[in-house]
């Protein structure tokens, strides 16, 4: 990126901040702020340890020194402008969840639009199934944000979690990932005796904790068992038995499980009560089922494996309403209802369709506002929103 491109981007960002309001987080004066400027994007040097006392002070700063990227801390500090974490005096932090398309399976074969579609499905599942149903957070205690890049953030501002330290937040991460779920803790034998029609069997299996909460991993396991057995039950006998033998089952257990798989009433009991009307040694079957459940339902959180975003109590997160300097898209705050129909390639675009002259340095395919632009190297005119995207990505330079 050359100097005239940086100057052009800086002025277009300044114009945006002069006419638009950003989302000011609660406790503004207790937040640390950090910025990366257009002149510094090559080395990605962040200016941290800033503090603002009012919304007006923040707005003036954004207009006078328009950044490429703007961040605020998830944490609240007594002295947010202090140069060291110890001197800042940590008071608490929002609980942050960061889902990024880079962490989705099969992402290498997706277009940008497909990545955004898939990560939206994940963030909806995180909010509805895990944060609301399982953990009991209320929608009004969450701020949902499109990151402006490849994913979404959820800020949970429930005061019950504000003072949680990293180990407790790590436990929440582990829950979302299904870490620590083991078959011998999930499945228990009961003394219940059931009538199979031809005989009476004792020691059937039950999914532990099924009735304790309306959601939870126990019900996901039950759902997965029913789906798996229903699939197998629809196969011809030979194929069904072969599929069950893959679970290292004895012949007698294969026959029993196949009977359950083809009995709607038995599947209903698994789905509604967590009751698996089978006896015998089924540990291998349960281990495989549990692994499949975790793989299917776990949340793909962004962040390094040793320090995910959620567990990091001192992390900076993008300022909602700011511009993402790597895409030119708006970091867009959303309600849960708005998220349903939100399309980043339409709704997060803030620049115009007016033509801008650029030198394309790398060929690219750009999806924008319902159109696909196949851009070749060389000088040409493009809609401003496409040109801004390419310049922010380092694939084009401004040509006056």
Swiss-Prot record:
UniProt keyword annotation of Chaperone present: no
Q: Which InterPro entries match?
A: DNA_primase_S, DNA_primase_ssu_euk/arc, DNA_primase_ssu_PriS
Q: Kindly state which keywords UniProt assigns to this record, in alphabetical order.
A: DNA replication, DNA-directed RNA polymerase, Magnesium, Manganese, Metal-binding, Nucleotidyltransferase, Primosome, Transcription, Transferase
Alphabetical GO CC annotations of the entry are:
DNA-directed RNA polymerase complex; primosome complex
Which GO molecular function annotation, any one, does this entry have?
metal ion binding
What is an example of a Pfam family matching this protein?
DNA_primase_S
Q: What is its EC number?
A: 2.7.7.-
**What does UniProt list as catalytic?**
98, 100, 306
Q: Give the required cofactors.
A: Mg(2+); Mn(2+)
Name the domain of life.
Answer: Archaea
Keyword Nucleotide-binding included in the entry's annotation: no
Specify the enzyme's EC class, one word: transferase
Record's Gene3D superfamilies? DNA primase, PRIM domain
Name one process (GO BP) from the record.
DNA replication, synthesis of primer
Tell me, what does this protein do in biology?
Catalytic subunit of DNA primase, an RNA polymerase that catalyzes the synthesis of short RNA molecules used as primers for DNA polymerase during DNA replication. The small subunit contains the primase catalytic core and has DNA synthesis activity on its own. Binding to the large subunit stabilizes and modulates the activity, increasing the rate of DNA synthesis while decreasing the length of the DNA fragments, and conferring RNA synthesis capability. The DNA polymerase activity may enable DNA primase to also catalyze primer extension after primer synthesis. May also play a role in DNA repair.
Q: Which family does it belong to?
A: Belongs to the eukaryotic-type primase small subunit family.
Task: Kindly state the subunit structure of this protein.
Answer: Heterodimer of a small subunit (PriS) and a large subunit (PriL).
Stated name of the protein: DNA primase small subunit PriS
**Gene source species:** Methanocella arvoryzae (strain DSM 22066 / NBRC 105507 / MRE50)
Q: Which gene encodes it?
A: priS
């Amino acid at each position: 990126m050359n100097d005239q491109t940086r100057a052009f981007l800086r002025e277009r960002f300044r114009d945006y901040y002069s006419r638009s309001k950003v989302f000011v987080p609660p406790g503004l004066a207790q937040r640390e702020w950090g910025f990366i400027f257009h002149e510094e994007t090559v080395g990605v040097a962040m200016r941290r340890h800033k503090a603002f006392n009012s919304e007006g002070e923040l707005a003036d700063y954004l207009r006078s020194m328009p950044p490429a990227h703007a961040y605020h801390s998830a944490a609240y500090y007594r002295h947010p402008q202090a140069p060291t974490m110890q001197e800042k005096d940590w008071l608490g932090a929002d609980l942050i969840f960061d889902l990024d398309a880079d962490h989705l399976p099969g992402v290498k074969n997706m277009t940008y639009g497909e990545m955004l579609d898939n990560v939206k499905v994940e963030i909806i599942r995180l909010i509805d199934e895990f944060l609301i149903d399982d953990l009991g957070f209320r929608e009004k205690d969450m701020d949902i944000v499109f990151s402006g890049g490849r994913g979404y953030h959820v800020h949970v501002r429930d005061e019950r979690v504000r003072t949680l330290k990293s180990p407790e937040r790590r436990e929440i991460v582990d829950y979302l990932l299904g870490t620590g779920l083991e078959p011998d803790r999930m499945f228990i034998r009961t003394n219940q005796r059931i009538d199979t029609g031809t005989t009476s069997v004792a020691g059937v299996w039950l999914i532990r904790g099924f009735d304790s909460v309306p959601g939870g991993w126990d019900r996901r396991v039950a759902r997965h068992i029913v789906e798996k057995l229903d699939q197998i039950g629809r196969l011809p006998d030979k194929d069904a038995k072969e599929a069950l033998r893959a679970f290292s089952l004895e012949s007698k257990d294969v026959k029993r499980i196949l009977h359950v798989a083809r009995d709607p009433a038995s599947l209903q009991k698994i789905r509604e009560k967590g009751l698996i009307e089978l006896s015998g040694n089924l540990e291998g079957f349960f281990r495989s089922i549990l692994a499949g459940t975790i793989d299917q339902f776990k949340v793909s959180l962004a962040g390094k494996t040793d320090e995910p975003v959620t567990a990091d109590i001192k992390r900076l997160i993008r300022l909602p309403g700011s511009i993402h300097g790597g895409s030119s898209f708006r970091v867009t705050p959303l309600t849960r209802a708005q998220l349903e129909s939100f399309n980043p390639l339409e709704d997060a675009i803030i620049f115009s369709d007016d033509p801008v002259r650029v030198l394309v340095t790398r060929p690219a395919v750009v999806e924008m506002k319902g159109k696909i632009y196949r851009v070749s190297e060389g000088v040409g005119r493009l809609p401003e929103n496409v040109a801004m995207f390419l310049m922010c990505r380092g694939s084009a330079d401004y040509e006056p």
